[in-house]
């Protein structure tokens, strides 16, 4: 469990670095959009750094959004594209009352899972009600959905969302990233760390083969 938690934390921080700097780079090419977004942030108080605002952003919003998007919207999306399967975090066999036989859990197909991940990410982005936040929230939502599918546990996506939002406040510590070259190198390193952390998380979620499952070559 601790290995998974560590991977999720690293994924959240690395994802924030990648998404944050890529968003800033895109806005630097669109000065009018950047000005409109800055005005929106000022008018809505999204840049508020008071204790209450930070707690709401880091703890309250991720918890509620994960319950809604990954907990409800993703489940119904998954069932819509894969009507034969049950929720991913209920991977178990169930008995039929009429004869007591065990019915295996029907696995969703790959395209159905991918479609559900994309749909919930799109809805997650739309919920932010502006195109700047919508784009990076949608991109982050793809990773959140992947983590849910990989771990099968909603608690890991809640933790991931906590870390991702907290990372936005830690970006100010990277004062040494100034030039375009610095940004490119930082994004490349963070991207590599992100991919490696996702790979390790995937490996940690693959069950080890049982002794009875191993072929007998003797």
Describe the residue ranges of each PLM region:
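Alpha-helical membrane-inserting segments
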Residues: 15-27, 77, 123, 127, ...
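Juxtamembrane helix-loop-helix connectors linking adjacent transmembrane helices
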Residues: 1-64, 74-105, 109, 216
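C-terminal membrane module of polytopic membrane proteins
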Residues: 28, 162-218
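Active-site His/Glu-centered metal-binding helix of metallohydrolases
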Residues: 63, 67-68, 72-73, 130, ...
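Membrane-interfacial alpha-helical segments at the cytosolic side of multi-pass membrane proteins
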Residues: 70-81, 170-175
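Alpha-helical hydrophobic membrane-insertion segments
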Residues: 2-6, 10, 14, 111-118, ...
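Membrane-interface starts of transmembrane alpha-helices
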Residues: 49-53, 104-120, 153-156, 178-182
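Functionally important transmembrane alpha-helices
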Residues: 121, 126, 133-189
């Amino acid at each position: 469990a601790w290995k998974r938690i560590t991977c999720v934390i690293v994924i959240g921080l690395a994802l924030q670095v990648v998404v944050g700097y890529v968003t800033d780079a895109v806005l630097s090419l669109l000065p009018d959009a950047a000005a409109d977004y800055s005005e929106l942030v000022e008018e809505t108080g999204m840049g508020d750094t008071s204790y209450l605002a930070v707690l709401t952003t880091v703890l309250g919003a991720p918890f509620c959004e994960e319950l809604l998007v990954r907990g409800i919207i993703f489940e119904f999306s998954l069932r819509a594209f894969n009507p034969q399967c049950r929720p991913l975090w209920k991977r178990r066999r169930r008995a039929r009352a009429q004869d007591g036989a065990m019915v295996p859990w029907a696995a969703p197909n790959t395209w159905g899972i991918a479609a559900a991940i994309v749909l919930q990410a799109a809805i997650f982005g739309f919920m932010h009600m502006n195109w700047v936040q919508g784009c990076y929230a949608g991109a982050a939502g793809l990773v959140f959905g992947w983590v849910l599918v990989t771990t099968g546990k909603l608690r890991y996506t809640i933790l991931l969302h906590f870390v991702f939002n907290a990372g936005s406040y830690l970006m100010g510590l990277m004062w040494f990233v100034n030039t375009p070259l610095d940004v490119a190198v930082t994004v490349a390193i963070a991207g590599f760390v992100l991919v490696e952390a996702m790979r390790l998380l995937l490996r940690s979620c693959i069950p080890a083969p049982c002794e009875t499952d191993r072929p007998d070559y003797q």
